């Protein structure tokens, strides 16, 4: 073994890249470490492509091993299972910047596997895995127009921070990951606390400048390894065949792309393609039908892009900055806590919001330990939304990624637990799709949250921008269609409020995206966002004053922390009986905060009354009405409060001389007693005869020592 090692400083960290020790049968393998966070990245490429394949089969797998953090997995099998949501998102983060760098026509299967071997809780493994992927591809010999660099950018005290630690990220107003080559930005993924566009753009530029350190180090590392590149030659373009197809189809393609309705347009294009393929193959049987179809698709791209660059109307007749027709509705599902239907052109999201209690929070088992999440956003993309049939089941990578992007878009406006003590789950059902369904989910989520009475800080809207660029000519498109996304050069998604950006995602398919282009895109995105927010605010501009009648009301009271054990009872018997008998959900916190959740107000008040009784102190001189629980020769025991029995001595039953207690009292009798004394051991002395002498009524109200009800999340409905 002859290991080759490259070490370089990167921000506040030191990065080490090593090869030649592990996974030597892979096409390439590197171990990359950053301050004790270590990731093994392997690349395997097939030398030959499968005949007839018309797509590039790239697979990226990212896996976290719990031993990396000194932990044993939970569950029955005690081993890692299917990828978590976090692992899936990191795999997508690695995939997106490298996929466009494989050359056109390269169809050999390639698999990238990144395995976290050691983790420092302060250093996230995702950037390490991205650096490792770049280095492994650079030394693999596989055709690849890299290397890439990757950087995380934070924003603290108006300063950009390179690769902030996990602790610093909690303070940061920005979490932005940028990846790119020496010449261009390829991918951006970010979440922000409502920051201005210029701050977001500055972060992208700053990150791209800093990641040049990685690219330089990887180039030096690859030169030292010295792997020979594969002897692969891109297939020659069939210019003659493309000209023949153009002669037969260009005019018809142009007409088809004037059809504004997606389904009708697709049918026309499909029929035209089948006719052209059949004609050419019939005229020359040596022609490959797949090649004809591919060249036909290239012509589609040429027609659509050329029309946009010439200033002609887009596919659906809009100009570059025009937004499709909007339709907004709230409260569309009668028994759902909050709902909205957001439609933009042929893209539609039905969004539902559900309110729950703390026990509904999601427990997430991460490599560094467990955490709970009180806000969930799930995105579903069924096949019917694009007029297709397909398998239904667990969410795919795309659905997980789009759901996380939508969540990033609204996270900045979600109220804290102190402001709104509910756990919130939002589900976005995409019922129609023709571009930017994730941004429709952002808009629908904002509306559904307000419809549910969640006091979000501001309305949030999202928009997807596109780009068509040839040479120095370019056009930035607002609110792109699915075809414009597919045939264009950039997918640039921006979510935010009227004050600033909350999320930015960018995927670029070409090099040469300048700062000027990004500035124009952000400016158009802001204009579009403000237009959409105006329409949304007409439907519902602030959160409803009342939550749904079908949602649980959360009532909060405070008790003496020393009394928590009285509410719980032995083995949880008391609190279990309370919840079962009142039909409520009760949660206790160490500081004595008690949260009672119930759909019925009467049930909640009954639970509160019983908790107050359980935790109230016995007051000397106060009269209580209680039940006789036990008789003894020397007196009777009376239960005056839950869990609190006192003794009525035989001499305190009546003024007369009592020979036998049972002559005056029986078990189960309700009697009025006065508290005479509570001794140091907590024993309570009661008197029936003193209570009779006292003219005060029995204690029907809560004792002064009982806890006060602090807050009730119960509001008055707002009329529309």
From Swiss-Prot:
Mg(2+) binds at residues 485, 491. SUPFAM superfamilies: Eukaryotic type KH-domain (KH-domain type I), Nucleic acid-binding proteins, Ribonuclease PH domain 2-like, Ribosomal protein S5 domain 2-like. It is found in: Cytoplasm. It catalyses: RNA(n+1) + phosphate = RNA(n) + a ribonucleoside 5'-diphosphate. Keywords: Cytoplasm, Magnesium, Metal-binding, Nucleotidyltransferase, RNA-binding, Transferase. The keyword Transmembrane helix does not apply. GO terms for cellular component: cytosol. Residues 552-615 form the KH domain. Its EC number is 2.7.7.8. Pfam families: KH_1 (PF00013), PNPase (PF03726), RNase_PH (PF01138), RNase_PH_C (PF03725), S1 (PF00575). Residues 621-689 form the S1 motif domain. GO terms for biological process: mRNA catabolic process; RNA processing. It is an enzyme of class 2 (transferase). The keyword Magnesium applies. GO terms for molecular function: 3'-5'-RNA exonuclease activity; magnesium ion binding; polyribonucleotide nucleotidyltransferase activity; RNA binding. Disulfide bonds: none annotated. Its cofactor is Mg(2+). Residues 698-720 have a biased composition (Low complexity). Residues 697-720 are annotated as: Disordered. It comes from the Bacteria. Involved in mRNA degradation. Catalyzes the phosphorolysis of single-stranded polyribonucleotides processively in the 3'- to 5'-direction. NCBIfam families: polynuc_phos, PRK11824.1. Component of the RNA degradosome, which is a multiprotein complex involved in RNA processing and mRNA degradation. Belongs to the polyribonucleotide nucleotidyltransferase family. This is Polyribonucleotide nucleotidyltransferase.
């Amino acid at each position: 073994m002859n290991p080759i090692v490259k070490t370089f400083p990167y921000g506040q960290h030191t990065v080490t890249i090593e090869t030649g020790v592990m996974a030597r049968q892979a096409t390439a393998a590197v171990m990359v470490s950053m301050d004790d966070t270590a990731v093994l990245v392997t690349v395997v490429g097939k030398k030959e492509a499968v005949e007839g394949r018309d797509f590039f089969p790239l697979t990226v797998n990212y896996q976290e091993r719990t031993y990396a953090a000194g932990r044993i997995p939970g569950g029955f099998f005690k081993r890692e299972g299917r990828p978590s949501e976090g692992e899936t998102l990191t795999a997508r983060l690695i995939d997106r910047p490298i996929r466009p760098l494989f050359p056109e026509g390269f169809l050999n299967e390639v698999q990238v596997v990144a395995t976290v071997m050691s983790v420092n809780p302060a250093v996230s493994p995702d950037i390490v895995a991205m650096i490792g992927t770049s280095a492994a591809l650079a030394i693999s010999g596989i055709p690849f127009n890299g290397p890439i660099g990757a950087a995380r950018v934070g924003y603290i005290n108006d300063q950009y921070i390179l690769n902030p630690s996990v602790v610093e990220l909690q303070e940061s107003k920005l979490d932005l990951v940028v990846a790119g080559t020496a010449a261009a930005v390829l991918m951006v993924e970010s979440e922000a606390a409502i920051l201005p566009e210029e701050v977001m753009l500055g972060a992208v530029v700053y990150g791209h400048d800093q990641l040049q350190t990685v690219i330089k180090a990887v180039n030096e590392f690859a030169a030292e390894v010295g792997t020979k590149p594969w002897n692969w030659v891109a297939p020659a373009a069939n210019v003659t065949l493309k000209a023949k197809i153009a002669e037969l189809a260009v005019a018809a393609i142009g007409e088809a792309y004037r059809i504004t309705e997606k389904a009708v347009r697709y049918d026309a294009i499909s029929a035209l393609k089948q006719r052209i393929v059949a004609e050419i193959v019939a005229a020359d049987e040596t022609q490959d039908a797949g090649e004809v179809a591919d060249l036909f698709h290239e012509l589609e791209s040429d027609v659509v892009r050329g029309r946009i660059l010439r200033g002609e109307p887009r596919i659906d007749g809009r100009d570059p900055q025009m937004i499709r027709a909007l339709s907004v509705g709230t409260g569309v599902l009668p028994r759902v806590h909050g709902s909205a239907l957001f439609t933009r052109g042929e893209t539609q999201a039905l969004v539902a919001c559900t309110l729950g209690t703390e026990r509904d929070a999601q427990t997430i088992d991460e490599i560094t330990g467990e955490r709970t999440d009180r806000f969930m956003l799930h995105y579903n993309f069924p096949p019917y939304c694009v007029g297709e049939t397909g398998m239904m089941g667990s969410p795919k990578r795309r659905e997980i990624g789009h759901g996380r992007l939508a969540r990033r878009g609204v996270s900045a406006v979600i109220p804290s637990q102190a402001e709104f003590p509910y756990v919130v789950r939002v589900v976005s059902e995409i019922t129609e799709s023709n571009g930017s369904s994730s941004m429709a989910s952002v808009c629908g989520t904002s509306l559904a949250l307000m419809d549910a009475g969640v006091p979000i800080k501001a309305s949030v809207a999202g928009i997807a921008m596109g780009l068509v660029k040839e040479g120095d000519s370019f056009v930035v498109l607002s609110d792109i269609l699915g075809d414009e996304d597919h045939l264009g050069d950039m997918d640039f998604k921006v979510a935010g409020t009227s004050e600033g950006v909350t999320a930015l995602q960018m995927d670029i398919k070409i090099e040469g995206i300048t700062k000027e282009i990004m500035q124009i895109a952000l400016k158009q995105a802001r204009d579009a966002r403000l237009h959409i927010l105006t329409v949304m605010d007409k439907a519902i501009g602030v959160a409803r004053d009342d939550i749904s009648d079908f949602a649980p009301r959360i009532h909060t009271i405070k008790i003496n922390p020393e009394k928590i054990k009285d509410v719980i009872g032995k083995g949880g018997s008391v609190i279990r009986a309370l919840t079962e008998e009142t039909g409520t959900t009760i949660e206790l916190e160490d500081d004595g905060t008690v949260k009672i959740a119930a759909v019925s107000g009467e049930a909640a008040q009954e639970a509160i009354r019983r908790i107050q009784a359980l935790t109230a102190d016995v007051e000397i001189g106060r009269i209580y009405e209680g039940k006789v629980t036990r008789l003894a020769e020397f007196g009777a025991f009376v239960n005056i409060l839950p869990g609190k029995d006192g003794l009525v001595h035989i001499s305190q039953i009546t003024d007369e001389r009592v020979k036998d207690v049972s002559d005056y009292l029986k078990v189960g009798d309700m009697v009025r007693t006065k508290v005479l004394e509570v001794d140091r051991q907590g024993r309570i002395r009661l008197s029936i005869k003193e209570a009779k002498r006292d003219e005060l009524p029995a204690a029907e109200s809560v004792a002064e020592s009982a806890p006060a009800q602090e807050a009730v999340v119960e509001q008055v409905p707002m009329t529309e």
